[in-house]
Amino acid sequence: MVATLFIDADACPVKDEAYKVAARHGYKTFVVSNSWIRVPATPVIEQIVVDAGPDVADDWIAERCGPGDVVVTNDIPLADRVLKAGGAAVAPNGRVFSHDMIGSALASRSIGEHLRSMGEVTKGPAAFANADRSRFLQALDQLVVKAKRAAPR
C-alpha cells in the first residue's frame, strides 16, 4: 500500500510546505485544482487539473482517498468524506479534522451558510498567520508519520 497525500490546491496557502513534507517522507502527492498551478518537477508530485465547478476537485479527491492517505483541505464536507473513507485530513491552519469534531464543524458551517443566505453578516476566518503555517507543518508531519507507521509492510 502506497500512502498518498492529496492537496485541495485551489486557494491553499501551504502548498509549498506540503510539498516539502511529502518529499521528506516519499509520499506520492496529487495537487488537485481547477486551474494550472506550478508544482515542483519531481516524480512524487503530480498535478491534476479538474473541470471548473463546485466540488469537482473535492469529488476527485474523495473518490480516490482511502486508509493511510492524508488530505490537505479547508473544506469541511471534504474532510468528512475523507474521514469516512479512512483517511486523515488537516486544514492549512493546522487543524486536524477528527471523527469527534467533524459533526459540530459541519453543523457550524451549515448555520453560517443559513445566516448568510438570510442576509446576516457573519465574520470570516481570521487572517492566515505564520503561527498557522507552523501548526500546519507540525500537524501534517505527525499525520504522515502516523500513517506510515500504520501501513502494512
UniProtKB/Swiss-Prot annotation:
Pfam families: DUF188. Transmembrane segments: none annotated. It comes from the Bacteria. HAMAP family: UPF0178 (MF_00489). Belongs to the UPF0178 family. This is UPF0178 protein CCNA_01273. It comes from Caulobacter vibrioides (strain NA1000 / CB15N) (Caulobacter crescentus). The lineage of its organism: Bacteria, Pseudomonadati, Pseudomonadota, Alphaproteobacteria, Caulobacterales.
